[in-house]
């Protein structure tokens, strides 16, 4: 299992997993960090505490993991993206290994989880062309924009239930990764000088996440759980580097200028609150709200002469998720009655500004299933399948429509059970 975790982790690290021009700003497109069980509910989960699923978005949930078992969860996805700007359309495809996580019960009322998740993605390649002089139309220019890589986090977390109904937890993560972004300006006339700028950053820092869950029984068949999360603001200690290369069209000589900004990136305060209503262990309905306070942070920007940290490049990011799951009976003898049916919807505001205006807003809907995997001795493992549609758009800019298929495998193994010889 350890070897499998390592090989899958390397695959996760190798992914950028994105085709979107909007990933060229900030730290890229922030990941939803959904797992197999909540992808079908569009990421809702701050109030969920499942005994047979790994819910890393609120570490307090680890205290609910079954004793005597080891949970291993890995997810893959494939997506088709459609881009539309001024009637010009283009499609792109991606397939990725998204996450690898595990959890187990360490002591009474204490669970442990660890794994690797995406934090953000950078991936785009497009060009813009036009006439240098609209009147003469003799020469035209081409600006080419390219970017790749992304950021990931490897975490370990604890969840503990000190008193009945109340759980607390924490994740500590190593956050690492890099981005490379290039802008190249070239001309059809070989006598005009060309210009290219390369922007890069490499991060290796930490991230802390804290969580609380409180469950209250409100009737004979109904429970309500309140979930809260908090991640503190801190500087990632990483520099932002940029170099500019001017190519002389006459003799081919290069003029290179380099810039570097120390401690250029920060993570903001992040808070979340969620409610989950559980009716008779059949219906589970959740509502989450998260806020990421990016607005007061600065971003590295080239102003034409210098590479500097600038205010006004970020906005606070708000996200609302609503999701539900229905299962007639987890231990029913009928297979279809053990299947978990899920659906969800979410709305997200941008954390970046583009040319002084808000970046892309996101609206997403999803639906999916949790299918029990039946083997010779148990049916506690699950195959989680979901489909998601995402609309991403900003005023007067490109519109993106994304259809994504998520597949997660949750293996529930009896690692700690003592077997008796008959």
Can you say where each PLM-predicted feature lies in the sequence?
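Bacterial N-terminal signal peptides
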Residues: 1-9
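N-terminal, post-signal peptide beta-strand-biased segments of exported outer-membrane/organellar beta-barrel
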Residues: 12-118
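Outer-membrane beta-barrel porins/channels
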Residues: 15-39, 109-422
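Peripheral, non-catalytic segments of secretory and membrane proteins
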Residues: 3, 75, 103, 129, ...
